[in-house]
Curated annotation (Swiss-Prot):
Annotated active site: 52 (nucleophile), 102
PTM annotation, UniProt: The conversion to 3-oxoalanine (also known as C-formylglycine, FGly), of a serine or cysteine residue in prokaryotes and of a cysteine residue in eukaryotes, is critical for catalytic activity.
Disulfide topology: none
InterPro entries: Alkaline_phosphatase_core_sf (IPR017850), Sulfatase_CS (IPR024607), Sulfatase_N (IPR000917)
Source species: Escherichia coli (strain K12)
A GO molecular function held by the record: arylsulfatase activity
Cofactor: how bound: Binds 1 Ca(2+) ion per subunit.
Binding site for Ca(2+): 12-13, 52, 284-285
Presence of keyword Calcium: yes
Name listed for the protein in its UniProt record: Uncharacterized sulfatase YidJ
Keyword terms: Calcium, Hydrolase, Metal-binding
UniProt keyword rRNA-binding present: no
CDD domains in UniProt: sulfatase_like
Cofactor(s), names only, from the UniProt record: Ca(2+)
Length: 497
């Protein structure tokens, strides 16, 4: 049987509130919306972490950033960590990554050096884009194109943009002669609609008078929310007034522009390629936009930054919507199942095309960036999302519980409401069990001792249990016996602590 191709498209800073088929807002995302109409739309998909590098780590390694190493921006995965590219390349795929990487431990732009598991002829990270610009153009791109007048005066059209050049390379890849025995995995990773918001002037003109209505979320006084949310709001004041209207034409324009670039790539699939290609679209995280008095992203678990778009179009064009919570952590296992690649033990995710039982998913936050203390510095957060509720443990401040069905805007924190004592305890236990299962290195008994949990006891997570096999690393030997860990019973080791 012919193995399928994969076209994996992602954006940066584009939560469900910025995609028309999810939000219902008059934002032009017609290409993404068309993909949703032809495929499977996941309505409760969550990022692994609402910050760039940790989110991408979950996506491209299949394990959480706390496991792989980059628990904050500008930290790279460990050298023993395998990626999507490695798994697929070793399975005989032509693996190609074009665009923003933000996973090499360097700065936002990256080093420009292609990892060995991807095709170096198509690698085009931020540093590669910068190498094509003059010093004047670099200065313009980062700080000088903030208005219609700026764009017109500098004659900026789509050919100047990183997004357009990414799309050019992706289209070129698709136009190359097919190799009969080598299916492809191509990742197309756009920076837009992330800052610096560069797009042709006609897109910016569209949104000059557009105001995004936040509704009641703009009125949240944060009185019953964690302290660090209030500190964040004070340090970075929201631009949204009492009218609840968010005005950011550059952001909206780039959101529109990147949709057209996505359309260019998807429409470049030949009929033969389309018959055998799974198309996957998602984003790394969102932007608060003034909701709950917050801007940017950071140590919060509101849907504005954690609930991301996820659409999967099969070659056969199966159409449906899925409301069950899923995670970026599930994408690599799902793709491996479709490609008939054996999933290694280390990957905790599931094939979300086959999930039928109710489930929960975890979201984490630890620190925004290694070099500075934005959003309070080290603020460890763990979140558990189910069909009906969202529990947020803020280790250093206070916790949150939201009713997802009756309070989708997350205005009412129910953590101290005794009516939900059973719900919060069951979710708390499920989250602690999951942290134990994945061997979250930030696990400690403090996560179990929450003031609202009257039956709380210090919870010990067990003794030495080695990392599950990833299919590449040498077998770990048990400390006590010196034997390969496959011969050691994990449960016995847990009880020994």
């Amino acid at each position: 049987m012919k193995r399928p191709n994969f076209l994996f498209v992602m954006t940066d800073t584009q939560a469900t509130n910025m995609v028309g088929c999810y939000s219902g807002k008059p934002l032009n995302t017609q290409n993404i919306d068309s993909l949703a109409a032809e495929g499977i739309r996941f309505n409760s998909a969550y990022t692994c972490s609402p910050v760039c590098t940790p989110a991408r780590a979950g996506l491209f390694t299949g394990i959480y950033a706390n496991q792989s190493g980059p628990w904050t921006n500008n930290v790279a995965p460990g050298k023993n960590i395998s990626t999507m590219g490695r798994y697929f390349k070793d399975a005989g795929y032509h693996t190609c990554y074009i665009g923003k990487w933000h996973l090499d431990g360097h700065d936002y732009f990256g080093t420009g050096e292609c990892p060995p598991e991807w095709d170096a002829d198509y690698w085009f990270d931020g540093a590669n884009y910068l190498s094509e610009l003059t010093e004047k153009e670099i200065s313009l791109w980062r700080n000088g194109l903030n208005s219609v007048e700026d764009l017109q005066a500098n004659h900026i059209d789509e050919t100047f943009t990183w997004a357009h050049r990414i799309s050019n390379r992706a289209v070129d890849f698709l136009q190359q002669p097919a190799r009969a025995d080598e299916p492809f995995l191509m990742v197309v990773s756009y920076d837009e609609p992330h800052h610096p918001f560069t797009c042709p002037v006609e897109y910016l003109e569209k949104y000059a008078d557009f105001y995004y209505e936040l509704g009641e979320k703009a009125q949240d006084d944060l009185a019953n929310k964690p302290e660090h949310h209030r500190l964040w709001a004070q340090a970075m004041p929201s631009p949204v007034g009492d009218d609840g209207l968010y005005h950011h034409p550059l952001y909206f324009a780039c959101n529109d522009f990147v949709d057209d670039q996505i359309g260019r790539v998807i429409n470049a699939l030949t009929p033969e390629q389309r018959e055998n290609t799974w198309v996957i679209y998602t984003s790394d995280h969102g932007e608060m936009m003034g909701a709950h008095k917050l801007i940017s992203k950071g140590a919060a678990m509101y849907d504005d930054i954690t609930r991301i778009p996820l659409i999967i179009r099969s070659p056969q064009g199966e159409r449906r919507q899925v409301d069950t919570p899923v995670s970026h952590i599930d994408l690599l296992p799902t793709m491996m199942a479709l490609a008939d690649i054996e999933k290694p033990e280390i990957l905790p995710g599931e094939n979300i095309l086959a999930v039928k039982e109710p489930r929960g998913v975890m979201v984490e936050f630890n620190r925004y960036e290694i070099e500075h203390d934005s959003f309070g510095g080290f603020i460890p957060v763990r979140c558990w999302v189910t069909d009906d509720f969202k529990l947020v443990l803020n280790l250093f401040t206070s916790d949150e519980l939201y009713d997802r069905r009756n309070d989708p805007n997350e205005m009412h924190n129910l953590i101290d409401d005794i009516r939900f004592a059973d719900v919060r305890s069951k979710m708390h236990d499920a989250l602690l069990d999951y942290m134990d299962k994945i061997r979250d290195p930030f696990r400690s008994y403090q996560w179990s001792l929450r003031p609202w949990r009257k039956d709380a006891r210090p919870r010990w997570m067990g003794a030495f249990r080695p990392r599950p096999q990833d299919g590449y690393s040498p077998v770990v030997r048990d400390y006590d016996t010196g034997l390969p860990t496959q011969g050691v019973k994990v449960e016995e080791k847990k009880q020994k602590f």
